[in-house]
């Protein structure tokens, strides 16, 4: 059972134990239940229900309803899961239920709602669950009035501030504030350490910090679960942790803890110990392998070294999951580990050992289900079919193991469900026997030297494979017919040619199809409207984009850029309400600008560059462009005309400096592949800079870019452009814009790349541009500008080519003097230009990331020219080992 399910069951059992005898009343009809609810309570409940959109409710669910006391008729419990949508206001009828003892409002949609101070009026509450419901801001201090609370769950919201609200909550047994934005230093005198009845405490995935984990945690000696994962704690774990003798689960991962592993030998009830992703050093105490109830141990990603000693008595160990990867152990570690015969999951990935791993040493693991040897040196002899590896094995990961032959060991594994041998040197053809493994569902063999398939084009059809990743090989010829069970298929960066087979239309379970960077020709099959993600970029496809998207089509991402497509943009895309990415750039599509797509509530990326779009870019109402979530707009190289209204940039997503901060670092969609692994979709961007085009992986969720260059736009640049504070790149070059450079550009505090060249702009360059500290590239050449060039560091560091073609400009870096200043020697500019060109040519090896100086600034400044989604098969442990 997963960690999440264990926790949920624990909380629900506690909740049920707090419910007093009462009558249940359905959501639809609060009058049933023998009239248990009083008339005033019925009226208040009806008012509360009407405050929200309840279309998502399962009205027959026993989890959604209200309970009333049999004797008084007062509402004592309200419970709604994944049901309510709207704003929970401070004048809500909810706060009329003064006899409430249990309130469960989880997985609802109270987006942009703060937690009202009125909750403090419900001072008889014993259980309060508000998790996963979109609450934001600080928890009001009035919570300290809820002195009867025994369980409080505020997890998975957008809450901030400190934990001062727990003062006076002395009866708390359960406190979960994980997955929020709580912060600050946990001081020894914090009210948290006065909650001596706590049995469950989760502070994970916040921003708490401390020079060391407070010793006072040792005072909470009734704790059964403690989670401080994914915070900013550092230093050594205090020895007082050994006082928590009731602990069954201890989570300290993804912090900056140092020193030796914490002393847990006294914690004899411990079943889960997660310490991964820290800086622990030294050796592993052998006593860890003899703890009587320990079943899960993750030490992955630390600085542990030395040998591993496992006592002979460990054969009776209950340890089932052991994660030791990414450490620096010495010697032959497999032999001692082989004594842990009850292991089901074993991670030895990226071990820095000087000895090859001999798979025959795994023969003692009779129940092994998952084995991860990614990044290890594997003995070639151990890959033969004579290996003694457990027949129970369900998942085997041998990525980046320098394997040159397809491992025949797989033949003898009838229960194998998931295999990863990607990023090796495997050559030749994929063996026919692979597709006969009866339970095989996920195959990752990308980034090898494979050239084809053994057998006929029908060889895959009857396979049980659901996920197949063949990326970055040398596969050629026609695409084989896919398995009938296929859900996810990626074969990007190969040499497949011919038509996309129509047999794909019979694969009703297919969600993801990624065939980009091949040599496919012919039309796009019209039957792909059921897909979630379709990527056909950089092939030789012809015809039009099929206009076959039905109502509520599930499409999230469509990329058909760099083909030979013609016709119009399909109007049926209006039916794709989940669409986030749309890229049709570099084709021959002839159409007007698709204003109609603004009804798509989730569209973030729109790439139409280098087509034949024509007509006005100004909206019909002469107002804002009106796309609610759009943040990357690339429409360069078309025939769009007209002027932009002053409100064109009003109400754009990029107006917020904190845009998408709650959505993680990268644009990503993940789904479970096998148990503890995920397959992730990551978006990518084509980076355009001075004629150079580079593909960059991992688009930041906080990136906002606009490229309107190479059209026929005219008139003034709207001052409303200054509202887009999250913008990092703006390209309006090669148009016919007139008037002054907007002063509001100085408000673009994140801007890194600004190109206004080849227009008809006049006046001076605003001094405010010189104060933009991230501005790494600016080009205003070939306009009608005059006056002195601002002398900020980011401006004077530009080459003179960025300002030439403006007869009235003067000052550095040009040679024209302003008010008697002397021009620097000519050879200085030559050196600057040579240096800049060298930087540009060296960009391809630069990773995405914010940095200092012109080189890194330029790299990040251009993280935007055109969106290009890419399917990547990422193996990420769900337990965040």
From Swiss-Prot:
- GO CC entries: plasma membrane
A GO BP entry is: leaf senescence
The UniProt function text for this chain reads: May be involved in ABA-induced senescence responses.
Q: By which gene is this protein encoded?
A: RLP41
Q: Tell me which UniProt keywords the record has, alphabetically.
A: Cell membrane, Glycoprotein, Leucine-rich repeat, Membrane, Receptor, Repeat, Signal, Transmembrane, Transmembrane helix
- TM regions (residue ranges): 845-865
Q: Signal sequence: where? A: 1-21
Please give the Pfam families that the UniProt record associates with this protein.
Answer: LRR_1 (PF00560), LRR_14 (PF23598), LRR_8 (PF13855)
Give the protein family.
Belongs to the RLP family.
**Subcellular location, in the record's words?**
Cell membrane
Q: Cross-referenced Gene3D superfamilies, in alphabetical order? A: Ribonuclease Inhibitor
Q: Specify the protein name.
A: Receptor-like protein 41
Enumerate the InterPro entries for this protein: Leu-rich_rpt (IPR001611), Leu-rich_rpt_typical-subtyp (IPR003591), LRR_dom_sf (IPR032675), LRR_R13L4/SHOC2-like (IPR055414), RLP23-like (IPR046956)
> What are the annotated glycosylation sites?
58, 70, 91, 109, 145, 189, 243, 266, 305, 312, 402, 462, 506, 519, 575, 731, 779
Q: What is the membrane topology noted in the UniProt record heading this document?
A: Single-pass type I membrane protein
């Amino acid at each position: 059972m997963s960690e999440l399910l264990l926790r949920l069951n624990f909380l629900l059992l506690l909740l049920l134990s707090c419910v007093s005898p009462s009558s249940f009343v359905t959501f639809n009809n609060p009058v049933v239940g023998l009239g248990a609810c009083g008339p005033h309570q019925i009226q208040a409940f009806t008012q509360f229900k009407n405050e929200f959109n309840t279309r998502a409710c399962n009205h027959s669910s026993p989890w959604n309803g209200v309970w009333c006391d049999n004797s008084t008729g007062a509402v004592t419990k309200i419970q709604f899961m994944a049901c309510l949508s709207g704003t929970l206001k401070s004048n809500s009828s909810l706060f009329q239920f003064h006899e409430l003892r249990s309130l469960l409002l989880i997985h609802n949609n109270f987006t942009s709602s703060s937690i009202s101070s009125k909750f403090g009026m419900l001072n008889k509450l014993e259980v309060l669950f508000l998790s996963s419901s979109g609450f934001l801001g600080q928890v009001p201090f009035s919570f300290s009035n809820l002195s009867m609370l025994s369980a409080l769950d505020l997890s998975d919201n957008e809450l901030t501030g400190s934990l001062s609200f727990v003062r006076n909550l002395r009866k708390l047994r359960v406190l979960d504030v994980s997955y929020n934005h709580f912060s600050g230093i946990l001081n020894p005198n914090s009210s948290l350490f006065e909650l001596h009845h706590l049995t469950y405490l989760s502070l994970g995935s916040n921003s708490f910090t401390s020079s060391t984990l407070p010793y006072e945690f040792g005072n909470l000696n009734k704790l059964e679960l403690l989670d401080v994962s994914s915070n900013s704690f550092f230093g050594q774990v205090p020895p007082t942790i050994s006082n928590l003798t009731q602990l069954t689960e201890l989570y300290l991962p993804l912090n900056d803890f140092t020193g030796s592993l914490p002393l847990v030998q006294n914690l004899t009830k411990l079943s889960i110990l997660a310490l991964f992703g820290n800086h622990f050093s030294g050796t592993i105490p052998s006593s860890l392998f003899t703890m009587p109830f320990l079943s899960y141990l993750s030490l992955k990603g630390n600085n542990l070294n030395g040998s591993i000693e496992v006592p002979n008595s460990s054969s009776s160990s209950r340890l089932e999951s052991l994660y030791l990867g990414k450490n620096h152990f010495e010697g032959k570690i497999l032999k001692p580990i082989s004594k842990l015969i009850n292991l089901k999951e074993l991670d030895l990935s990226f071990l820095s050992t000087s000895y090859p791993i001999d798979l025959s040493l795994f023969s003692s693991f009779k129940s092994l289900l998952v084995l991860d040897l990614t990044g290890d040196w594997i003995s070639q002899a151990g890959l033969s079919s004579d290996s003694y590896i457990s027949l129970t094995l369900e998942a085997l990961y041998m990525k980046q193991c320098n394997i040159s032959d397809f491992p025949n060991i797989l033949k003898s594994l009838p229960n194998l469900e998931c295999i990863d041998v990607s990023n090796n040197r495997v050559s030749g053809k994929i063996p026919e026997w692979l597709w006969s493994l009866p339970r095989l569902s996920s195959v990752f063999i990308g980034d090898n030297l494979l050239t084809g398939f053994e057998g006929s084009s029908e060889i895959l059809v009857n396979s049980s494979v659901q996920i197949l990743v063949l990326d970055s090989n040398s596969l050629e010829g026609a695409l084989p017919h896919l398995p009938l069970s296929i859900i996810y298929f990626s074969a990007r960066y190969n040499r497949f040619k011919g038509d996309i087979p129509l047999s794909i239309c019979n694969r009703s379970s297919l969600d993801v199809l990624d065939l980009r960077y091949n040599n496919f020709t012919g039309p796009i099959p019209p039957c792909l409207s059921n897909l979630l993600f379709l990527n056909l970029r950089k092939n030789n496809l012809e015809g039009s984009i099929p206009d076959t998207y039905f109502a509520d089509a599930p499409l999230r991402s469509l990329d058909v850029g760099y083909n030979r497509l013609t016709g119009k943009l399909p109007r049926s895309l209006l039916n794709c309400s989940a669409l986030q990415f749309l890229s049709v750039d570099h084709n021959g599509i002839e159409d007007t600008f698709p204003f109609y797509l603004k009804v798509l509530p989730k569209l973030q990326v729109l790439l139409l560059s280098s087509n034949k779009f024509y007509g006005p870019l100004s909206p019909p109402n002469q107002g804002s462009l009106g796309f609610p979530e759009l943040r990357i707009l690339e429409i360069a190289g078309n025939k769009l005309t007209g002027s932009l209204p002053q409100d064109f940039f009003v109400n754009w997503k990029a107006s917020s400096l904190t845009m998408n901060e709650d959505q993680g670092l990268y644009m990503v969609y993940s789904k479970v592949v096998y148990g503890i692994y995920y397959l992730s979709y990551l978006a990518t961007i084509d980076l355009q800079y001075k004629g150079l085009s580079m593909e960059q992986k991992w688009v930041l969720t906080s990136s906002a870019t606009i490229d309107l260059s190479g059209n026929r736009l005219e008139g003034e640049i709207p001052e409303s452009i200054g509202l887009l504070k999250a913008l990092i790149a703006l390209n309006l070059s090669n148009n016919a814009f007139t008037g002054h450079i907007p002063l509001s550009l100085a408000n673009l505090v994140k801007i890194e790349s600004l190109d206004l060249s080849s227009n008809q702009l006049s006046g001076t360059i605003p001094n405010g541009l010189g104060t933009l500290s991230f501005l790494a590239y600016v080009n205003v050449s070939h306009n009608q500008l005059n006056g002195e060039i601002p002398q900020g560091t980011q401006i004077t560091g530009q080459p003179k080519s960025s300002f030439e073609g403006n007869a009235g400009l003067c000052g550095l870096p040009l040679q024209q003097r302003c008010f008697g200043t002397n021009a620097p020697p000519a050879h200085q500019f030559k050196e600057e230009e040579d240096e800049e060109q060298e930087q540009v040519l060296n960009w391809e090896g630069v990773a995405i990331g914010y940095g200092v100086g012109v080189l890194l600034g330029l790299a990040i400044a251009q993280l935007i020219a055109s969106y290009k989604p890419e399917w990547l098969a990422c193996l990420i442990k769900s337990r965040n080992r």
